[in-house]
Curated annotation (Swiss-Prot):
Keyword Magnesium among record annotations: no
Transmembrane stretches, start-end: 155-175, 203-223
InterPro entries membership: DUF2068_TM_subgr, DUF2127
GO cellular component, as recorded: plasma membrane
Membrane association type: Multi-pass membrane protein
Keyword Cell membrane: yes
Principal localisation: membrane
Alphabetically ordered keywords of this record: Cell membrane, Membrane, Transmembrane, Transmembrane helix
Pfam families: DUF2127 (PF09900)
Protein name according to UniProt: Uncharacterized protein Mb0093
Subcellular location(s) of the protein: Cell membrane
Length: 256
């Protein structure tokens, strides 16, 4: 029962090891190494530093306990999964913005043809009984056609810049870089007032969901990654991360 509960608790570690393989290490501390090694009929096995299960074969590395690779496990691994999911969301958003910028640019070059089509077809549609003058899409299209070319060029540039911003943010988060986390918090926070302004003009599902995701991302990164000195800052985060390492846990178990 206890073993099953441990597997449930370590499911993300097991999934990660299943995808990327186990990580084993032989410390030069004999007593500590003995707690990580076992013998079977198939040969020696070593405990994985991430999931804690035994893996068949020799250790992948040897050395002092303090030189063991820093493996993401426990809370750190769960944080990495969440942050990478946020990074994927940012990259998808960057792609959508880039496509929007391309669409506006293409529209800017095809305004004449679109206007000619509307001038030719709208009267026909009205005569056929279609209430085209009440269609939101038609109003939006006519408004866009009335915009100056310089305005459309400015919109294209702003969308492209925002796409680049989201792409940088997404890459930094996916790579789990500290600068990416800081960049994400600052870049996202800058646009929160604009999102509040949009919500004040009218509440829509898209606006509410976008605002909620961004606020949650900022709060989560600040608290979980201890950015800008929150909860002790980087030093406290490193201490917490080191405390989750299997070798440290095993050393602590030896002293009890």
């Amino acid at each position: 029962m206890a073993k099953n509960q441990n597997r449930i608790r370590n499911r993300w570690e097991l999934i990660t090891c299943g995808l990327g393989g186990h990580v084993t290490y032989a410390p030069d501390d004999a007593a500590l190494a003995a707690r990580l090694r076992a013998s079977t009929g198939l040969g020696e096995v070593w405990r994985c530093l991430r999931c804690g299960d035994f893996a068949l074969g020799g250790p992948q590395g040897r050395g002092a306990p303090e030189d063991a690779p820093l493996i993401m496990r426990g809370k750190a691994l769960r944080q990495a999964i969440i942050i990478r999911a946020l990074g994927v969301e940012r990259l998808v958003r960057a792609l959508v913005l880039a496509l929007a910028a391309w669409a506006v640019w293409e529209f800017r070059g095809a305004r004449g043809a679109i206007q000619a089509t509307l001038d030719r077809d709208l009267p026909v549609l009205r005569a056929a009984g279609f209430k085209v003058d009440q269609m939101t899409v038609i109003h939006a299209l006519e408004k866009a056609l009335a915009a100056k070319p310089s305005t459309l060029a400015l919109i294209t540039g702003m969308l492209a810049a925002y796409a680049v911003l989201q792409a940088v943010e997404g890459v930094g988060l996916w790579l789990l870089k500290r600068w990416g986390e800081y960049f994400a918090v600052v870049a996202t926070s800058i646009f929160l007032p604009l999102e509040v302004h949009d919500l004040a003009k009218g509440i829509t599902t898209t606006r509410v969901v976008t605002f909620s995701i961004n606020v949650a991302a900022v709060v989560y990164l600040l608290i979980s990654k201890r950015l800008f000195g929150v909860r002790g800052g980087r030093k406290a985060y490193d201490v917490e991360r080191r405390g989750e390492q299997l070798l440290d846990l095993e050393r602590a178990a030896m002293l009890t």
